[in-house]
Amino acid sequence: MLDQNQLKKYNQEHLSEYEKLMSSNEKEKLESKVNELDLESIQQLFQDLYVNRQSISDVSSVSEVKYQRKTELTDQEGAKYEQKGIEAIRNGEFAVLLMAGGQGTRLGYKGPKGSFEIKGVSLFELQARQLLKLKKETGHLINWYIMTSDINHEETLSYFEQHDYFGYNPDNVHFFKQENMVALCETGQLVLNEQGYIMETPNGNGGVFKSLEKNGYLDKMASDGVKFIFLNNIDNVLVKVLDPLFAGFTVVNDCDVTSKSIQPKDGESVGRLVNQNSKDTVLEYSELDEAVANTFDNANIGIHAFKVAFIKQAVNNDLPYHLAVKKLKQLDEDFGVVEKPTLKFELFYFDIFRYATSFVTLQVNREDEFSPLKNKEGKDSVETATSDLERLNLI
């Protein structure tokens, strides 16, 4: 039986009503899961991030990041960075980390987002091609680490196997799953998914480093002599995966965190790379007052390089949760399936920046390096991604 006092204390009494309609086996699973949860912490998250949520309007502690515009590099500087990058890649100083835990639902596609194809070429293949090109240029096959999630892990592995890893050596591709976090309804109560279990959703990309560590991959990188982790996500179809110039820029500056950015447009719903309290960080657009957001010159495009030594030192430090509200299918009080606004609590990888001591950013051209694929139609859509890939002769 569920602990009624605990349920009442933390606003979860509705679970008793669900329990009455469950089989013995279902009751056992529900009780086991609820007993695993820290209901006090979950309620505190609900209060802090939903009930008392605020946008950031005071920018007294926020300033522009230290950055270099790629367009302002001289030919000699660009060539120097490229050469340094090629040397570092050849010497095995970089690993590549891809965050690919999402589904293609918003594209009208059933399956891992990375397996979505544009004119017969999947997002995974677009990135694999670039890594294979680097192998030709440097003679070194980079270890490729790919973070999946419970919702797409098996399908992702199957997709790679069906496509012979796009010509990549399977021994150099390492898959691991991000962890989950419970979801809540807008009154702070746990919800049941369509299968009747406590709903959990991927805990955001901020769990990427702990998941790397848990799977032994941080230790592997260190033992392999890897000094930097190049990180990117599956959304950006124009990402330059570990381009030598950025690799060289990373090596020469030798910072804990090296980032790429673009000049944001006013009102653009993209996080801003800023310096807050003497630390570089990303402030999500949804967390900023709009007028404040428009004062900063660097939009985060999810491309960074991290020192392995820094990540190993900071990996177990606490990161804050952020709130996302999304319509998700769940069970109502009669066990019918409904779709309702649901609170998801997510960790963001960039919150690890607060533990770093050195930062630098390279601002690149949007037209060359940023085209997010988020929607089936309209802005940031299949149509815009296709157009951008064709414009740069990438498909």
UniProtKB/Swiss-Prot annotation:
Superkingdom to which the source organism belongs: Bacteria
GO function term, MF aspect, one: uridylyltransferase activity
InterPro entries assigned: Nucleotide-diphossugar_trans, UDP-sugar_pyrophosphorylase, UDPGP_fam
Residues holding UTP: 99-102, 113, 178, 204, 235, 344
CDD domains referenced in this protein's UniProt entry, alphabetically: UDPGlcNAc_PPase
Record's keyword annotation contains Flavoprotein: no
This protein's UniProt keywords: Nucleotidyltransferase, Transferase
Protein EC: 2.7.7.-
Protein transport as UniProt keyword: no
Family: Belongs to the UDPGP type 1 family.
Name by which UniProt lists this protein: Probable uridylyltransferase SH0870
